[in-house]
Structures are given as structure tokens and as C-alpha cells.
């Protein structure tokens, strides 16, 4: 697997400061995609054990809230095969850090049902992810006011609760704003 880039102190792709890994390879080809160059599976650099180790080291500070996976498409089967052992390492070393994943595939669609995205790694990979932002980017539904997603059709999903309930459960985390009382 190749990766397009790594953001070592990202505040846009999940709550708090995070490390964000942008994988290469995506077959969705959404019009208006912000990362079109990452559609190519060969784009960027090889995701090596040394890169994994560097990310694991970068996650050590307590102010880092977690890891975000973006793309490209993390749930392309070829990417799942590489990401799954890496996510195991992340969860083993940092069980309290949140893993967020952005996917054009939907949880209750392609990831839970028979599809080209669902493979022998999908269920375990989902079990290691805390929050999934699912759904393809739809340019006509783009809204810059949305937090942690690009278009209104995309959902922010609490994966552990969804797996337990066998249905999609919306993430109720840190996205409420309290007015200041005078």
C-alpha cells in the first residue's frame, strides 16, 4: 500500500489534535474530491514498517487524541490488508486513543453487506475503529459548515455502538457548542 501524505498535527479530521494518514487508492472517483491524486494506488510513498513505527512514536504525546485514516479509500480491499495489522498495533499500544476512518463506502451498505469492499479483513478492521465517517463526497451537498465531513450525506458513526446494536448509531461526541452565558 502507498500513502499520499501524513499530517502529524491535524485538527480538521476528528476532535483534538491527531495524526492523519492519507492512504493511496480509491475507486469512487467522486466529482469535486479534495484529494484526487490519491485515487491512484501507486501515488505517494510506500507504507513501510518504518513509517508505521514513526506514526506510533508520533502518537505518544498525551495531547494527541488519536489517529485518522483518510484517502484515497482505507476500505479498498488492498488497503485493508495492510491497514489491519497496523491498526492492531495502534490499539495494542494506545488503547485509549481514538481511531477515526473516512470512507466512501457506507457501513450498512458495502461494509456490512456483500460488495467488492467487503473482504476477510473488514469485520476486524471495523472492530478497531471508533468513529467512521461514511458515504461518498457529493459535490452538490458540499457544506463548509459541517464539522468533520465534506457533504451533508456523510454520516459520523459510533462504530462500537453500531456493531453492538447491529444498526447504525450516530456519533454523539464532541460536536455540540454551548453558548457563553453573560
Where are these regions (language model features)?
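P-loop/Walker A phosphate-binding loop and immediately adjacent motor/lid segment at beta-alpha junctions
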Residues: 86-91, 142-182
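Residues at the C-termini of beta-strands that transition into short coil/loop
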Residues: 7, 103, 136, 160
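Short glycine-rich, flexible loops that bind phosphorylated cofactors or substrates
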Residues: 76, 140-141
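Receiver (REC) domain switch/active-site residues of two-component response regulators
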Residues: 130
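Short, conserved loop/helix-junction motifs that constitute active-site signature segments
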Residues: 124-127, 150
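N-terminal [4Fe-4S]-dependent radical SAM core
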Residues: 1-22, 27, 31, 35-42, ...
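Conserved Radical SAM active-site core
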Residues: 1-3, 17, 35-115, 120, ...
Amino acid at each position: 500500500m502507498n500513502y499520499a501524505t501524513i499530517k502529524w498535527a491535524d485538527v480538521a479530521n476528528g476532535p483534538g489534535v491527531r495524526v492523519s494518514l492519507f492512504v493511496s487508492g480509491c475507486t469512487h472517483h467522486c466529482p469535486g474530491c479534495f484529494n484526487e491524486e490519491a485515487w491512484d494506488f501507486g501515488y505517494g510513498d510506500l507504507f513501510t514498517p518504518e513509517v508505521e513505527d514513526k506514526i506510533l512514536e508520533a502518537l505518544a504525546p498525551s495531547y494527541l487524541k488519536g489517529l485518522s485514516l483518510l484517502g484515497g479509500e482505507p476500505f479498498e480491499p488492498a488497503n485493508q490488508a495492510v491497514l489491519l495489522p497496523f491498526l492492531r498495533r495502534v490499539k495494542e499500544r494506545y488503547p485509549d486513543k481514538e481511531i477515526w476512518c473516512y470512507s466512501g463506502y457506507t457501513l450498512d451498505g458495502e461494509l456490512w453487506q456483500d460488495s467488492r469492499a467487503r473482504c476477510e479483513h473488514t469485520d476486524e478492521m471495523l472492530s478497531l475503529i471508533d468513529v467512521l465517517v461514511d458515504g461518498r463526497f457529493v459535490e452538490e451537498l458540499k457544506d463548509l459548515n459541517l464539522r468533520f465531513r465534506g457533504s451533508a450525506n456523510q454520516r459520523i458513526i459510533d462504530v462500537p455502538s453500531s456493531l453492538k446494536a447491529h444498526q447504525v448509531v450516530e456519533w454523539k461526541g464532541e460536536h455540540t457548542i454551548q453558548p457563553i452565558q453573560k
